[in-house]
């Protein structure tokens, strides 16, 4: 199993079960760190099992990475999946074509935009509307005009990426 995928799935299940957002973010950060390594660095850390020597990788995330690197499904992921309850509404969920109200970690949501769009694609959604807060809602980290422009650039890049996936 790919360690990045394992870490992101663990973050998803922790987020879904409303666990401590700091722990959720730790798994997302660890996924970003591993994803940022080139193949040679991954191989080097994998052979030496030295994941924890990387800044931002703690004992729990290192264990997940090691287990995934060795081809195992990480224990933490198995445990979270088995504890996950059915959210219900499967029939309605299957009929949904998209989502028109999404908050990312740019405001008061907990997931990065790219993960949200990847999940939407996996669910078969045809469209999504990102509805992060405006600057007036400072308590929710509303987007200033500058941050909104940056976010639109991110969205444009993802639009290109997911349009290629859909073709």
List each model region and its residues.
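Long, highly charged, low-complexity intrinsically disordered interaction regions
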Residues: 1-92
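An N-terminally biased module of ancient metal coordination in phosphate/nucleic-acid-related enzymes
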Residues: 75, 79-167
């Amino acid at each position: 199993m790919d360690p990045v995928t394992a870490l992101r799935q663990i973050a998803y299940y922790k987020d879904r079960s409303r666990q401590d957002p700091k722990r959720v973010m730790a798994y997302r950060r660890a996924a970003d760190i591993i994803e940022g390594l080139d193949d040679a660095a991954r191989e080097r850390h994998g052979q030496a099992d030295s994941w924890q020597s990387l800044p931002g990788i703690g004992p729990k995330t290192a264990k997940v990475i090691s287990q995934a690197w060795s081809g195992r499904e990480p224990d933490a992921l198995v445990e979270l999946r088995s504890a996950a309850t059915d959210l219900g509404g499967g029939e309605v969920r299957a009929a949904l074509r998209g989502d028109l109200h999404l908050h990312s970690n740019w405001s008061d949501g907990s997931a990065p935009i790219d993960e949200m769009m990847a999940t939407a694609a996996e669910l078969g959604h045809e469209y999504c509307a990102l509805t992060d807060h405006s600057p007036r809602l400072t308590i929710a980290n509303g987007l200033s005009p500058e941050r909104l422009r940056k976010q639109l650039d991110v969205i444009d890049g993802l639009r290109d990426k997911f349009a290629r996936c859909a073709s």
